[in-house]
Each structure stands twice: as C-alpha cells, then as structure tokens.
Amino acid sequence: MTGSDADFRARLDALIGLTDPPRRAKDAITEAAIRIWCDAVGDENPAYQDPRWAAGSVWGGIVAPATSLNMWTLPGNRRAHRHAESLDRVNEVLATRGFTSVAAVQTEHTYVRPLRPGDHLEQFPSIGAVSPEKSTRLGRGHFVDLVSDYRTVEGEPVGRVVLRMLRWNPATRTEGPATSGDRLARPVRPVAAAAPIDLPPAGTTGTLTAHLQPGYAADPLDERPYLVGSAELADGTRFSADVAYLRPDLVHDGMPVVVAHRRTRDGQILPVLTAPRPQRRTSTRTGAEVSIGQRLAPWPIPVTQLSIAALATATFDFNDVHLDRDAALERGARDVYMNILGSSALVNCYLTDWAGPEARVVDFRTRLAAQNHPGDTCTLDGVVTGLNPADGGTHVTVDVRGTNSLGDHVIASATIALP
C-alpha cells in the first residue's frame, strides 16, 4: 500500500462510526402513500388499503407494508441538503478516487411493530463500515454500510435497517452481455414461415402436459436454459411453444401455465408458455399448514420502463439511475434499473400473497446481484427453510430467489409470523 493509499484508507476509517442528527420524514405516513405503493407493486393485500377489513383483522386498522420502513425518510426529488452528513463525507472521499456511481445492493430489516397511517418517523443514521476496494460485475468499488434506527417523533422504536451500497468507478466496468434492446427472442422451433398462425390470446390458461430441454444451444444472451413444452389450454386446444422465464427446476408436468406474447426486435409476436401469477390467499396460513422444503409457486414479473419508474417514485427514490436512461448510461449502467426498495416491495408482496393478509413480516434480508433492466422478466420463487415456535404461533423462514436473463437479480430471506 502506497502512502497515498494509506492516507485514503485512513480518511475512510475516520468516518466509520460517525453518527448524524435524526432525519425527520417530510410527512407522516398516509393511506394515500400506502395506496400508491400498492398500485406500483400490484399488491392487493387488504391490510394496506381496505379500512373496513383491516379494522376487523388482527391489525385493528390499516398498516403499511413492512419493507417500506426506510422509504418514509427519503428526501424525495428536492432534497433539503444537510451539509456534512456522514454518508456525504464518505462519498466525497470515495469520489477523489473516481468512485462516483452508486447502487444499493443489500439490506437487512428488523421490525419492532407495524407502521400505521399517522406515524411520523425519524431516521438515526450512522456509518457502519466501509470495505476495502472490491472487484464487482459493475466495476471496482467500495461497499458502504449505513445503519439506521427508526423511531416515531415521540421516540418509540419501530425498526432498524442496515443498507449496503456500492460506490464504484464507472470507468472500471467491463463489457458484459448485450442490453435487452439487443436481445433476439428465440422463435418456436420448427417454424413454418409460410403458414398462417392463429396465436392464442395472451392470458390464456392451461396445464403443462410435457416439456423438454432441447440439445441445441440456448440463447447466448439469456442465462436461463432453453425449454420447450406442450400444454392443454382451457378451451381444450393443444399448444406447443417455448417455456419462458422459468429455470428448469421450476418446471414440471401438470403445473399451471399461461400464454404470454413476446415481441422480437423485428416486430414479430411469439407466443410462449410461462407460469401465471400465484393466486393471493384471502385467509392466513397457520404454522400447521407449512413444512420445511415447501415451495412457493413461481411468479414471473415483466420488467418495463414504466414499472421501474413507478416503483422508484412510489418508494420516494428519485435517484436518476432509476428514471433517466442518459444518467444511468453516464454512471456505467446499461439502462435504467430497478431500485432496491422496488425489488424488496415485490418480494414483500410475493411473501404476503402466499402467507395471507394477517401474516406479519418479522425481519427481512435481501441482496441484489444482476440489475433488472427494461425488457426483461424477473421470476420470483421461494422455499420454506425454517419453522420455529413463537408466542401464539410459528415463525416461518422463507428464502426467495429472483432471476432474470442475466442471472440472479435478488436473493432474499424473511421471517414471517403465522398463527
């Protein structure tokens, strides 16, 4: 380590443990903000938006989604900048070595109690750690841990979040796979180009009757193995097509499927088979209904420019890399990409849809890898990995994995309290 390197490291070390005065949310939590979050995520949990149902439930009234904890104190699009905040000081030191791009890559949440409309939160942040320089798929950079305790303005603790961010040098990013705009969708094989084709409508449901993994090469721009399958559709039609957006371990004969339409670069529409969105439970599971190794049905989620922007704004995250393609490219990304609060929100919805509307998320951990870019599909799947007795019920641990064409996007784990 050179003298300048040692000085650089010493400047970073001097900031570890630095704390800030509390940052107060601009507004108290409102039902309107919760409803906008639900609209962006596609979450229909009545605990978040049905006052009559919520009043008669274990919640006793509307509650906010658990993973929204750290969004309420975000500064929004017009930051009232407080000079010399600890994170700003770390970023200033890192910027002297070219580490100017940022991405949130990991969070750990612990929840003390549910958040409710009217709660006005304060964030008490401190710098937990700054890593040595690392090589990542985004480029070379440093991981910075921001530890935040959250309390109401009356001083009541409601939770803690450890947020890990990567500050990387965009000039060090190596060339990777092509963007979704350069991705050619595979046609169904074989193709009778001259024959007229009546496509089944998108959304047509059915049952997979057979599937296989062909011997020829998969799409080199998609990390997922290539599968084809045959299904019996709801109207009795037999239909064969690519099985899309699903890893082979998630595909089995007899599973429900739905027809989706995939558009190629030249404007063709190709029908594919994929998994439907899992049905949301209207009653809450009990611990007796759950076993270790139990799998959650997969949920393929289209990633679009609209969904990325909607999730970012609904979670008060106006970082330009989620909203402005030019800014994202300038900072070394291939396009705008989904924010960590958005990815966490989708996982939160996936878990509570499976567990039921009175299930309580006790803690939540998530790590991001490959970014979610427009034109891709991110498929969530999960498995129960732990069961522990708790007061009045069972604490269930569920591990969730979200994959897209670039590989793993999100690896998450949550503890859920069931009756």
Name these PLM-found stretches.
Residues 1-22, 104-190, 237-299, 372-419:
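HotDog/MaoC-like acyl-thioester-processing domains
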Residues 2-106, 176-177, 181-197, 280-360:
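Hot-dog-fold acyl-thioester-processing enzymes
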Residues 48-51, 113, 135-138, 217-222, ...:
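Short histidine-centered beta-strand/loop micro-motifs
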Residues 57-63, 114-120, 197-207, 290-291, ...:
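Short, glycine/small-residue-enriched coil/turn segments at secondary-structure junctions
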Residues 99-108, 234-243, 357-365:
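Short, structured beta-strand/loop micro-motifs enriched in basic residues and often containing a Trp
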Residues 205-241, 333-340, 344, 348:
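Glycine-rich active-site loops that engage anionic ligands at enzyme catalytic sites
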Residues 214, 365-371:
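Short, solvent-exposed loop/turn elements at beta->coil junctions and helix N-caps
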Residues 346-351, 355-363, 372-373, 401-408:
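Hydrophobic, well-ordered secondary-structure segments
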